[in-house]
């Protein structure tokens, strides 16, 4: 390609709306432009890099026997109603109607589409396992798109789905995708961290995310420096604490409950100051509104959960006072679509008192769900279910019995690793890929069945495996850039070599054209800068757009050509008859490093 044929509207100034480096550089390099908030267009150079990412993903999917499909982006709303996600997805799901007043969905993901497409086709155990994928446009009505390609409303995803008749087959597919993802990210030149993760609204289990470190990352990662344990904050676990008392009183010396006056003492901070003791001595009780829980309804011990026709349940969540509830863990533990703090009015209706004085002792209207930390406490302090009153000397199990006990705490830096006991540390990260075992969530909801070897109807299990191509492309720029511009890995670069004559005339033009034609003959992707521009402008543009190799044709250096790697500081002079050999060798070596 010649520069005079290329559309490359580079910018010298950083656009005001750009915050992260990838957004700044992709805009300045003339690779993307935004039409509206969260809606981006790829320009020719950016699209060439994007297509390289797409090609790598296709090659690795094909290598594990995964078959590409092309379902529609707009799908019937009824299949989302069938799966149960029509309501649970919330306002991020873009719902539209056609002229026949039929409900449609602009797909944010494709579990429903693939299940509906294949449910009547995979009717025998002989049809399994089947590995499928799509690379398609998606839409999610994000409340706050930001950071350029990192979080958009319209985006491109590789979604893969596997269908199985047994757990062993699903486990094998999961491992195949895990290995394929590691290859994909390596070939793209990315350093990723595999972390245990929550499946969220997708459902299922056996979940792993592939993250890149980022100062503006959406996720907090908990990492162990000793054993390599890594998890998203939403999923992270830690070693249990020792038994927690008040003043180190031994368990055997438990005292009877005592009610005390605590006028206007509503928060843990207030209580700490009032009682002059540590917050770890308190049992914090929070009232949550839980939606569509699969395990809540009529609670244990004769207590009926406060429930309405919208499948909404009020519960009390108890946790040690110095800890915070992890709402992702809460939703996952209760198999619920959502869990949010109740309103002040709901708290009063459920507990009979105002916010700040709830507690588990004597709570009759709603079930108590406890974090594991609570069951290791004794001689604790809780709200007394009365305004301006608290209880002392509370003993879990003796004074109240939770309906369920789960790991609900938010793990923090300094907590002990659940595997080896070493203190964990945190990093911010962005998710590039996610793999997880869906199980029967969609096949049961949408009644997908097959006949097994005995002629009995069964539901197949599913795996789900996603990669965001736009975020992946932006993440490559985040990891590979300097103050002058992008430094594309050889595997992703729009072109592998840039040929830059000081002036496109005379002997310099002749030699530049010869090098260009020779590169093309050898299958080397070359960009010839044939513009009538100043040398400084040409060099600035080439540094900005990040082509890995630059050949400079100057009259003073002929018959030698200046050879420079974009990632290197120094350049060298190479005989014009040998320089294409060096380019070819370098391209092969750089690609080999990424394989």
From Swiss-Prot:
Q: Where on the tree of life does the source sit, at the highest rank?
A: Bacteria
The molecular function GO annotations come to: aminoacyl-tRNA deacylase activity; ATP binding; proline-tRNA ligase activity
- State the UniProt keywords alphabetically: Aminoacyl-tRNA synthetase, ATP-binding, Cytoplasm, Ligase, Nucleotide-binding, Protein biosynthesis
Q: Supply the domain comment.
A: Consists of three domains: the N-terminal catalytic domain, the editing domain and the C-terminal anticodon-binding domain.
Q: Which Pfam families match?
A: HGTP_anticodon, tRNA-synt_2b, tRNA_edit
Matching entries from Gene3D superfamilies are given as: Anticodon-binding domain, Bira Bifunctional Protein, Domain 2
Reactions that this protein is recorded to catalyse: tRNA(Pro) + L-proline + ATP = L-prolyl-tRNA(Pro) + AMP + diphosphate
> Which gene does this sequence derive from?
proS
Does the record carry DNA damage as a key word?
no
Q: What is the lineage of its organism?
A: Bacteria, Pseudomonadati, Spirochaetota, Spirochaetia, Spirochaetales
Q: Where in the cell is it found?
A: Cytoplasm
Name the job this protein performs. Catalyzes the attachment of proline to tRNA(Pro) in a two-step reaction: proline is first activated by ATP to form Pro-AMP and then transferred to the acceptor end of tRNA(Pro). As ProRS can inadvertently accommodate and process non-cognate amino acids such as alanine and cysteine, to avoid such errors it has two additional distinct editing activities against alanine. One activity is designated as 'pretransfer' editing and involves the tRNA(Pro)-independent hydrolysis of activated Ala-AMP.
- What protein name applies here? Proline--tRNA ligase
What InterPro entries does this protein map onto? aa-tRNA-synt_IIb, aa-tRNA-synth_II, aa-tRNA-synth_II/BPL/LPL, Anticodon-bd, Anticodon-bd_dom_sf, Pro-tRNA-ligase_IIa, Pro-tRNA-synth_IIa_bac-type, Pro-tRNA-Synthase_IIa_type1
Quote the cellular component terms of the Gene Ontology held in the record.
cytosol
Q: What is its main location?
A: cytoplasm
| GO biological process, any | prolyl-tRNA aminoacylation
Q: How does it assemble?
A: Homodimer.
HAMAP family this protein is in?
A: Pro_tRNA_synth_type1
Q: What is its EC number?
A: 6.1.1.15
Is this entry keyworded ATP-binding? yes
User: What is the similarity comment for this entry?
Assistant: Belongs to the class-II aminoacyl-tRNA synthetase family. ProS type 1 subfamily.
